């Protein structure tokens, strides 16, 4: 064999078999940065149609986790695929830099502002901390192969962005959506601040559930219930409420009933004492069972509307409260009579406004009753629950008491229960100017992917309260407003003043506002107007980036095409962006919204340090490389929960090896191939080569379409299938003989090299958005194209167009002339699969060794036999056997193997003849040449003659 080795076209390439990407990628990143690859892409796409994917800013605190990695990789895949589709798709990464988590981290180091450190210095420390966090996260994102304007990201703490956030507030105020209100909001006693809807999470909590009697002294109330003459009953009359927040009873100012609900006056007995209780008719049985009352009967019935303004005695304070009507009252649970504390509940507040009820607010920002709260002063509200229960027992007002496990709002940061607390706050009104309906209209115009996202955000917008945008924090964008110190009215020049403040902030940052004396801006008006001390909700910061970033930066043109974040952002960034954009501009800030699920472990559990199941992006990139992490991200259906685990990543590494090995095979067989000199015209190509190019062309259309539809798992699936089935399992296997043994410059060899070159060019672009490092590595190993020039980077170009030309020519020359087209070769692929199974069985039976030591006979029906016969003697090359014979199905022996191909039976036998030393085919013509006694005639022609001719395979 050694004598003839030099006559073979053996593969050779510098493209390594082992990726070793964990070590290779960092050097590639350094080179890309030195070459300003992102800038080169921008230059190449200048003037092209724009596609804007706006980056939702992660919070600048802590290391990135797998969820961050998934999010940024998905965005990167989209941006890279859009650039390859010849869009100008810049990507500007952002960070959310203000807010409580950063304050808390800084407090741990320097103390609270106003104590050991001034508010001004505290803000500077927050700015420095956020900058450090941004730098750390930026390096982590770069390591993932994310292409972005890393040198000029947007930060919500950039002076220019802070100024534009203030301008956004001005625009919303100018459009009439801003108002000040005294209203119950979710309040975290640990934060000492109100929370946005998106900052509230619901967790199970055990609370004291109590039924409380509010005594009614007016005996005539019994007459409102239709009872027989003389049967008014006996004992004290009382309306019974049910609540799980006993601590709110000091703020009770009414009992709400539903006007349309029927109520019963129930005669009952408790501890030998007769009493008459008012309860919704539908709940009487349930309530009596809960109270443990055996003896009871109905005295009479009336509608809730009959009870309006009946006065009830507060259970432990010396005043009465009215019965009011509220549509929010139902008979789903409780008693049908609802405890109403306007300072501690949104529905209570709304009803309270209708009846001009006092908005009692006896609870301080720290969750402790104020000093003037009778009986409970100085107690924390949650600890006071027990005190309230004891008070009710003393007063004889406690009807029943038990512990209840239920879902309750908690702070997403502290994981502690929240309270509703009425405070003076600034709101964006959802209804005053029709913002709710306008937002719903814009939601309908937007494309939501998956489509259930639309209904989700619609229901949230339909039910959400006014957006409380004020916070009582130190590190945040100020609400640059002046209000009258007595009336609270906004300064008449508020819109102009906001712009003046914005100009100052643009130069010096938010500290400019806090340093500003009112007199400097409003002159003598400072005697009557004061600065609003509040800062803006951080969701306002990020929610207005469509204005403060997209409209402010030169590389963006128009509104964003796409927002892409986790599914929790329907109630977060997607909603805050929609509401603020509609409030400012009357239109949605995006055309499409795409969501991904959360990352969970292999068992479906959320990743957490306490469970010990956390996998960090750094672990994966250090061990396997970023391309494996990127492949995993692309291969899953990211619209659902995304499963991660060591075994899962190992499987991705196996899949990666398949793609890499296929690419290496293509490259290693292009040694010495110069497209400018060696490309074979499509009409001169071997039929099988024409087919595989056509297959690749069709596949490219499907892959580009999958990228356009954001279905990256489809891209990976199709790429893997192509590498495994059409290439690895069929085409590349078949052409090895021709590639290695044919005359080096023969049409037979150059034809398959042409096909491999075109496929390699196309495949490199297909994988570039996902396997970015590997694609560039392949790109650098490809031969120069026909033009003789190649862009330095695959990312500055477009999808390969050589396949499309091949496909169009084949359509004309092949399909229409009844040659061997896609359908034919697809059927041959199936036949070959059956032959392979038969050969495998023969190997197990030890009747043959390797496939080339076998001859196969195909017993086929007339139609199938005619198709197979089209290949003539070249059928054996497709089946990779030394001989292939076609016989009629009627001549099949009894031991012929029936296949899954209709009308096909097979027999396998040892091939007759001697094994050729060069090509390893077993033939009967070996020894006929004195010069090459160990070679077959075909190999002799390929060495000394003009070379064999291949027409089909």
Swiss-Prot record:
ATP binds at residue 609. It is an enzyme of class 6 (ligase). GO terms for cellular component: cytosol. Its cofactor is Zn(2+). GO terms for biological process: isoleucyl-tRNA aminoacylation. SUPFAM superfamilies: Anticodon-binding domain of a subclass of class I aminoacyl-tRNA synthetases (SSF47323), Nucleotidylyl transferase (SSF52374), ValRS/IleRS/LeuRS editing domain (SSF50677). Pfam families: Anticodon_1 (PF08264), tRNA-synt_1 (PF00133), zf-FPG_IleRS (PF06827). A motif ('KMSKS' region) lies at residues 606-610. Belongs to the class-I aminoacyl-tRNA synthetase family. IleS type 1 subfamily. Catalyzes the attachment of isoleucine to tRNA(Ile). As IleRS can inadvertently accommodate and process structurally similar amino acids such as valine, to avoid such errors it has two additional distinct tRNA(Ile)-dependent editing activities. One activity is designated as 'pretransfer' editing and involves the hydrolysis of activated Val-AMP. The other activity is designated 'posttransfer' editing and involves deacylation of mischarged Val-tRNA(Ile). Monomer. IleRS has two distinct active sites: one for aminoacylation and one for editing. The misactivated valine is translocated from the active site to the editing site, which sterically excludes the correctly activated isoleucine. The single editing site contains two valyl binding pockets, one specific for each substrate (Val-AMP or Val-tRNA(Ile)). This is Isoleucine--tRNA ligase. It comes from Colwellia psychrerythraea (strain 34H / ATCC BAA-681).
């Amino acid at each position: 064999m050694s004598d003839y080795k030099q006559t073979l076209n053996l593969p050779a390439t510098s493209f390594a078999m082992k990726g070793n990407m964990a070590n290779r990628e960092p050097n590639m990143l350094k080179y890309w940065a030195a070459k300003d690859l992102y800038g080169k892409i921008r230059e190449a796409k200048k003037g092209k149609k724009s596609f804007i994917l706006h980056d939702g800013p992660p919070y600048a605190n802590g290391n990135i986790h797998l969820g961050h990695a998934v999010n940024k990789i998905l965005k990167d895949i989209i941006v890279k695929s859009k650039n390859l589709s010849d869009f100008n798709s810049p990507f500007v990464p952002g960070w959310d830099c203000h807010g409580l988590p950063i304050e808390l981290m800084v407090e741990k180091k320097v103390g609270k502002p106003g104590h050991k450190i001034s508010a001004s210095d505290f803000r500077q420390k927050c700015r420095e901390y956020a900058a450090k966090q941004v730098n750390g996260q930026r390096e982590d994102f770069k390591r993932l192969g994310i292409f972005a304007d890393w040198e000029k990201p947007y930060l919500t703490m950039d002076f220019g962005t802070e100024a534009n956030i203030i301008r956004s507030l001005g625009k919303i105020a100018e459009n009439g959506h801003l108002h000040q209100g005294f209203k119950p909001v979710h309040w975290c006693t640990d934060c000492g601040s109100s929370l946005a809807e998106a900052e509230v999470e619901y967790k199970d909590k055990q609370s004291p559930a109590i039924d409380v009697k509010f005594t009614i002294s007016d005996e005539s109330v019994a007459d409102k219930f239709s009872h027989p003459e003389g049967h008014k009953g006996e004992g004290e009359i009382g309306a019974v409420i049910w609540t799980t927040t006993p601590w709110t009873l000091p703020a009770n100012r009414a009992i709400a009933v539903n006007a349309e609900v029927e109520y019963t006056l129930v005669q009952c007995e408790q501890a030998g004492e007769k009493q008459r209780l008012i309860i919704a008719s539908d709940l009487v049985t349930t309530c009596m069972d809960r109270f443990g009352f055996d003896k009871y009967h109905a005295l009479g019935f009336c509608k809730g509307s009959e009870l309006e303004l009946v006065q009830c005695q507060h259970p432990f304070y010396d005043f009465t409260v009215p019965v009011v009507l509220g549509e929010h009252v139902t008979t789903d649970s409780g008693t049908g009579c609802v405890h109403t504390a306007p300072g501690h509940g949104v529905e209570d507040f709304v009803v309270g406004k209708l009846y001009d009820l006092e908005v009692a607010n006896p609870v301080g920002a720290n969750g402790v009753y104020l000093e003037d709260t009778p009986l409970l002063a100085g107690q924390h509200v949650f600890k006071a629950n027990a005190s309230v229960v004891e008070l009710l027992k003393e007063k004889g007002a406690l009807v029943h008491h038990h512990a209840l496990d239920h879902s309750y709002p908690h702070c997403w940061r502290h994981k502690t229960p929240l309270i509703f607390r009425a405070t003076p706050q600034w709101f964006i009104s959802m209804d005053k100017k029709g913002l709710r309906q306008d937002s719903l209209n814009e939601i309908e115009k937007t494309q939501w992917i998956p489509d259930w996202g639309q209904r989700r955000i619609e229901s949230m917008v339909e039910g959400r309260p006014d957006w409380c945008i004020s916070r009582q924090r130190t590190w945040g964008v100020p609400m640059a407003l002046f209000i009258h110190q007595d009336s609270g009215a906004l300064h008449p020049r508020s819109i102009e003043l906001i712009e003046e403040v914005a100009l100052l902030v643009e130069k010096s940052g938010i500290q400019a506002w806090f340093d500003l004396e009112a007199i400097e801006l409003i002159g003598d008006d400072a005697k009557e107007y004061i600065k609003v001390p509040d800062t803006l909700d951080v969701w306002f910061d990020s929610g207005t980036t469509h204005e403060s970033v997209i409209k402010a930066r030169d590389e963006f043109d128009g509104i964003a095409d796409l927002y892409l974040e986790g599914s929790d952002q329907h109630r977060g960034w997607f909603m805050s962006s929609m509401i603020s954009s509609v409030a400012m501009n009357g239109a949605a800030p995006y055309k499409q919204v795409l969501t991904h699920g959360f990352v969970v472990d292999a068992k479906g559990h959320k990743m957490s340090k306490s469970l010990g199941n956390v996998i960090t992006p750094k672990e994966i990139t250090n061990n396997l490389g970023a391309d494996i992490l990127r492949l995993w991200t692309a291969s899953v259906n990211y619209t659902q929960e995304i499963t991660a685990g060591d075994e899962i990543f190992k499987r991705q590494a196996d899949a990666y090896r398949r793609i890499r090995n296929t690419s290496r095979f293509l490259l290693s067989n292009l040694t010495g191939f110069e497209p400018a000199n060696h490309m074979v015209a499509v009409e001169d190509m071997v039929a099988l080569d024409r087919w595989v190019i056509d297959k690749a062309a069709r596949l490219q259309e499907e892959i580009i379409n999958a990228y356009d539809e954001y279905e990256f798992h489809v891209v990976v699936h199709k790429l893997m299938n192509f590498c495994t089935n059409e290439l690895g399992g069929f085409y590349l296997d078949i052409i090895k003989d021709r590639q290695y043994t044919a005359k080096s410059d023969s049409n037979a060899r150059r034809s398959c090299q042409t096909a491999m070159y075109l496929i390699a060019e196309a495949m490199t672009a297909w994988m570039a958005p996902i396997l970015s490092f590997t694609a560039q590595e392949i790109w650098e190993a490809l031969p120069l194209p026909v033009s003789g020039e190649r862009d330095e980077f695959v990312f500055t170009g477009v999808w390969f167009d050589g396949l499309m030309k091949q496909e169009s020519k084949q359509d004309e020359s092949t399909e229409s002339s009844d040659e061997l087209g896609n359908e034919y070769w697809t059927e041959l692929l199936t036949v070959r699969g059956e032959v392979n199974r038969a050969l495998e069985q023969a190997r197990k039976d030890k009747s043959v060794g390797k496939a080339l030591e076998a001859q196969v006979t195909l017993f086929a029906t007339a139609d199938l036999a005619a198709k197979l016969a089209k290949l003539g003697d070249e059928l054996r090359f497709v089946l990779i056997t030394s001989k292939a014979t076609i016989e009629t199905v009627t001549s099949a022996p009894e031991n012929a193997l029936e296949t899954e191909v209709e009308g096909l039976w097979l027999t396998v036998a040892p091939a007759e003849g001697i094994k050729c030393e060069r090509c390893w085919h077993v033939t009967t013509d070996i020894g006929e040449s004195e010069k090459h006694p160990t070679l077959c005639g075909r190999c002799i022609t390929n060495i000394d003659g003009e070379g064999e001719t291949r027409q089909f395979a």
